[in-house]
Each structure stands twice: as structure tokens, then as C-alpha cells.
Amino acid sequence: MAGGGSRMKKSCACCKRYLEHLGGKMSCFLIRMTTDSMHSMIIPDRFVNHFGGKIPGTIKLESPNGILYVVEVTECMNKTVLQCGWEAFVDAHHIKVGDSLLFRHIENSCFEVMILDSDGSENVSLKSNRNGVSDESQESEDSEGPAGPPYILSWKSKSRLSSLQKKIIKEKVRSIQSEVPIYVAIMNKSNIGLTSSPCQLELGARYAAAVHLPDRRQAVVLQRGAAMGHRDADQERQMHHQAVPDQWLEQDS
């Protein structure tokens, strides 16, 4: 308990110095991450009142590396909550329970977010990459034999793939003979609706750029691999997609 209290004091002291640096010109609020806030986050009422008790339907969060994320704001039990897009922001920055997030209102519906580790230190490693594509790794076929199309592997999946799984993926990619890059991800609970959050799958910035996904919300058709080459209504499913600047979120309809 003593160690936890010490870390909290360091975190608060760091935030206090930052707020003093702002000279009271900007509105800020501090959130300490809990298990619940990893999936959705409640904005403090006092901060919401700064906006006349109402925050627009979407806001932009500027991460430490300068990338903007669009997050949906909803009302739940008289509370203002960040939901769709929030979990993707948390995952992209490897935010953990016990970390502290300092939100600074920049302009309109845009907020700068400072991420502090559980010991109260700013996570400076997040500032090193400003191109927004390190969350994914692009793999290609082995140098032996004819080169095949590349596939883009979710950063969450890369560390969990065995050598056999990687071999199977390469063989599958080669057999598909796609003219565009293929996206590969390991399914988890949030992808198949086993959590309290909406079912969704994040498609990263590199894949979105590689296949020219539009920067707007729209419906698309997903077709199972067995149905490739012909259209089968029973094997097609329409999904609603919400595009955000550096990620694509696939959300169950």
C-alpha cells in the first residue's frame, strides 16, 4: 500500500507541475485507469459542465506521438462516456491499469492526452514514432521462390504467432493470390463479443493506407474465404465501419 501511495503522489505531483505550466489557460482533467476504464471512460461531470453540460458526439484525442484518434461520446446513466474508439486508443498506446491520463482541451472538440506510467513518469517512448504505422508489421514471402503478395500482421498478433502458424499464414496468403495486401489478426474476446464493449476489430493505419480505405463511415460486405470467386448471400455479412485518422474499426451491426 505504501508503494502505491508513493506512486500516486509522484503522479499527482507531475500533473500539478504540468497544470501550473499551463497557467490556468486550459481546462484539464486527470483519469487513473481502472479495469472498467480500459473499455470505456467516464468524463468527470465538472469537466462536462465546462462545455455547458454537453460534449459533441465525437471528440479527437491527440496522442503523445501526435496522432489524432476519433472517439465517440455517448450518454449512459446520466454520465458522459467515451466508448467507440476508446478501447482502440488504449490498446494502441499499451495503456495499463494504474496508468494516469491527463486530458488537456486544445480547441473545439480536440484534446491532448499525456500518458503517465503507474510510477508517475511520462511514457516518453510513445513520442518516438510519429508516422503511426509501427502498430503493425508487414511480412512478405520468403526470399526463396517467386515473391508473393505481402500481408500485414496486427501488432497484437505478431508476438503470439508460433513458427507453424506463420508458415500456415504464408501458405494461405500465397494460395489466395491477392492483388492487394492481406490483413492478418488473431481473434480475441473483444472481437467476438465476449466483453461488455461492442464487438469490433481494429484495422491499423498501414493496412488502411495500403488498400485505400475511405476516410469516412460506410457499409462494406465481408465474404468468407470459401465463397471467394462467387457471391453467396448466405455467406456474406454486411458490417458498418467507422474510419478514424489512423485506424479502421469494424463494428458489428
Swiss-Prot record:
Keywords: DNA-binding, Nucleus, Transcription, Transcription regulation. Residues 26-119 bind DNA. Residues 230-239 have a biased composition (Basic and acidic residues). It holds the Pfam family B3. The keyword GTP-binding does not apply. GO terms for cellular component: nucleus. Residues 126-150, 230-253 are annotated as: Disordered. GO terms for molecular function: DNA binding. It is found in: Nucleus. It comes from the Eukaryota. This is Putative B3 domain-containing protein Os03g0619850.
